[in-house]
């Protein structure tokens, strides 16, 4: 086993890094911390949550075997507001419900088509 600090980032091929920044900022409150000509990196709500939006329009949205990635809510009652925020920001809610009583979830897609699970544990 190798010792690591954990998963450090996820890089997504996107059509428009600026549009991805706007979506993830509106929905998840990410903050930009690095930018170059074709990439924007953002810090998520967790101390080590990093997403990189890399301009690669030819393969944008092609998850290559990755089914989804997730964000965990701090309160279960926020699931409805989360779904509404996704739709206002240009995303799509694909399904929602409860894994168990009081354990809500929603699967959504960002503007490039990546599936995101929003849930409470």
Where are the regions a protein language model picked out?
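Vicinal oxygen chelate
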Residues: 1-3, 7-15, 60-121
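Core segments of cupin and vicinal oxygen chelate
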Residues: 5, 11-54
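Conserved segment of winged-helix/HTH DNA-binding domains
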Residues: 49-51, 59-62
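Acetyl-CoA-dependent GNAT
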Residues: 54-58, 120-121
């Amino acid at each position: 086993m190798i010792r690591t600090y954990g998963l450090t980032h996820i890089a997504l091929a996107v059509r428009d890094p600026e549009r991805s920044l706007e979506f993830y900022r509106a929905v998840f409150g990410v903050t930009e911390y690095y930018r170059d000509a074709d990439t924007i990196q953002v810090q998520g709500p967790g101390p080590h949550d990093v997403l990189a939006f890399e301009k690669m329009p030819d393969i944008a949205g092609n998850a290559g075997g990755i089914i989804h990635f997730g964000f965990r809510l701090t309160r279960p009652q926020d699931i409805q507001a989360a779904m509404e925020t996704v739709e206002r920001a240009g995303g799509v809610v694909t399904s929602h419900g409860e894994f168990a009583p009081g354990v809500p979830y929603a699967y959504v897609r960002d503007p490039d088509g990546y599936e995101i699970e929003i849930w409470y544990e």
